[in-house]
Regions:
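Sec-dependent signal peptide recognition
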Residues: 2-9
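C-terminal motif of bacterial Sec signal peptides marking the signal peptidase cleavage site
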Residues: 16-17
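Short, conserved catalytic or interaction motifs in soluble domains
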Residues: 20
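A structural signal for conserved, well-ordered secondary-structure elements
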Residues: 23-172
Length: 172
């Protein structure tokens, strides 16, 4: 009986104290990368993830991201990153496909789709005009509005993405 009490008194507190740490590695990088090549679903702007080829360099690096608001899907950037994107210009970015990646693995894809466009985009999109006018950009579903018939998968709040941003103090 004394042995059982010993095990209970010794090992249970030891097991409780050995909490498993589920932190992500600190070298996780979230980036926006332009696509060099991709295919779309027939009759749609939906990008087939299996077909994408990422550009070698990132358009928006992790160090450029100040914060992300999961409720509004807004990314807040450094002033220098915002200025660099504004300098590229909405005309050059409009229609360009991108991927949000974690360590160069796509989480979701989308397009830079300017608000001056009269074309519909049935996929994830970012208005490049926002780079010249605000300190943030919003990742949206569908342009000019979202309709359930578009069947756009919503990975904007991917749990691994949120965990990385939370760990690094970049989640609003």
């Amino acid at each position: 009986m004394k042995i059982i009490k010993f095990y209970i008194l010794f090992f249970i507190p030891l097991l409780i104290a050995c909490k498993h740490d589920e932190q992500l590695p600190s070298n996780q990088k979230v980036e926006f990368i332009l696509l060099d090549s991709y295919e779309t679903k027939l009759g749609s702007k939906a990008i087939l993830e299996s077909s994408i080829i990422l550009n070698d360099s990132s358009l928006i690096e992790y160090s450029d991201i100040i914060a992300y608001d999961p409720e509004t899907h807004r990314f807040f950037l450094t002033a220098s990153a915002n200025q660099a994107l504004a300098k590229i210009g909405s005309e050059k970015l409009h229609g360009k496909a991108f991927a949000l990646t974690i360590n160069r693995e796509p989480v979701y894809t989308g397009y830079f789709w300017a608000a001056f466009s009269s074309s519909i985009c049935d996929w994830v999109n970012v208005d490049p005009l926002s780079f010249a006018n605000t300190t943030f950009f919003e990742v949206k579903l569908g342009y000019p509005w979202y309709s359930p018939e578009m069947q756009i998968p919503d990975n904007r709040n991917d749990q691994i993405l949120l965990d990385i941003l939370q760990q690094d103090g970049k989640l609003k």
